[in-house]
């Protein structure tokens, strides 16, 4: 820098206040409240140590009076403003208001650019003028994929418009089918007309979703009788309902339909033989088994063998799924087995087509084969397929585009928005689309809507409350104190959900003790898990009802493990086995394990207890005996059904009732279909048989027990729908007597809390649009805390 040139020093390591010359008034051409600035004429006077700290092009010398305060002159004004008094003179005002004039004496060379040019790099940017043009809204990924789908698949544009414009269903009554011995009710004739018209429509089937107990089976049999030339028909039903289908077909058709039960080890393997029948009856378990053996094979000592499935190699005229929610999991082997059947007409019968979430409806729609809702569409080309085929797990087998470029119609247009927005905005539109579809493929009537046609008698529900005796009270308080201590330790460690199985066991033991102390005490002293022929559920510690096995070889009641699995929904905890705590892998629809019934009876709790004169009954059992004595009459026999979730409790009740002079029969999950049928027939036809003991896990659904009019539920459960279904076994078409349902509850026990929890969950069911039964079945951490605070 030339001698005599203007030197300004600027600190670069800290943030300083700046003054803009443009903001100074004409009188104040100097910076106010600043320290005396000493400006030196040449760079030789600058200390070497300061040169390292400051930049060479400008140097600021601070006042010795205040080393902690820096001041910077921000030279951002124009040269004209800066040289108002003199072209080469600058004025700075010090603390004493003295004007200091500084002259610059240097020649401007080519190498020495004016300050204004040097300031260009630090000059403030001018604000950009806002555009007055309105920007178009940003396209979301969902909208982008929708546009791409419409571009490559233009037929999708009018799917919902066509559904909305379809003519609404107008109820009409069909004529009574020839050959039926039972006269159909008016609403059932309307149902028959709808069934016939649906088979002739583009849907070739649908969902009959009448409420439980309104005669879905009878209406379906009427459809079979409408045209006897249209056969064969396949009916897939739960094991407990198999014989009921056979009996009702034989009873109401005068034997005009030829029936074959495809069940058991002696079932036929001849396709021509099956084609000669009008109706083939089978179970979901058998259908899944033959499908698995055909596609995946089965192991023997000599290797892996595959066996063709007779059911999957016959062209049926129609396939009917009873209790169709059994295929609600579209990824289950049972759903795959059903979807691979060959048929022209497809039907789903279910009083609860939606149990857990709306997505489960897709499995039924997929079985019904309703296009385009079941197809996967490519957003890059016109590829469309019902099957998800990506052999290399990356590229489509049909068009070679990647997975992310394919989407399912039902998922894209009907589920995504509901999952994201609920039933508001775009979610409400998707929800309305689902309702529009269901109006075209589903018929649902309730008992309240058709009360005049049904003519059902009133149903009364009461709760009988009793108290422990002194001995039971001491035992319960001891067990409760120990259980609460363990539960509190889980809460303190923050591992409640990780120990759901352990907490489930604690609750189960308290529930069992409220039934009878022996259910807990003898279980702790003599656990029969290794007894031959007996399968013990490792969740409820009772004889397993419909036992199924996990891949880690642990056995559970089908209902117990189902509720356990559902408890992990909507949280991030890993689903683990409740016994060994490794990742749980289990098929909830697999066939039940075979149980030796004779060994089962030998190992019942009665055979393990000393049932001599020293045996003591319980408060609850004696309360049941008292209620049954009240029903006895010399004029008529009033039949009753007793439900319990614990087969050991039913064993004790059976022994006590026989001692009291009551004739009983018992239905258990270990029975074969034939044994179940014989037991039900004996109860219905034998006047002397007064009490039917039923395991809630085995007989809660698909039973018609309208011969009884009294229902006793011994142990309450937190899912109220379980008890509602048990009541529907009696309060249904064919019932002409008032129905009374009595629920037993021991006060000052966990049962009182469960009753309160039931009421809370029942209110939630009636208050919500989407009845999410999975949420009802689950015990949340708040529910667990509620149960342990009695």
UniProtKB/Swiss-Prot annotation:
Residues 31-48 have a biased composition (Polar residues). ATP binds at residues 210-217. It comes from the Eukaryota. Keywords: ATP-binding, DNA damage, DNA repair, DNA-binding, Helicase, Hydrolase, Metal-binding, Nucleotide-binding, Nucleus, Phosphoprotein, Zinc, Zinc-finger. The modification Phosphoserine is found at residues 25, 109. Signal peptide: none annotated. Component of the global genome repair (GGR) complex composed of at least ABF1, RAD7 and RAD16. Interacts with ELC1. PANTHER family: DNA REPAIR PROTEIN RAD16, TRANSCRIPTION TERMINATION FACTOR 2-RELATED. This is DNA repair protein RAD16. It comes from Saccharomyces cerevisiae (strain ATCC 204508 / S288c). The gene is RAD16.
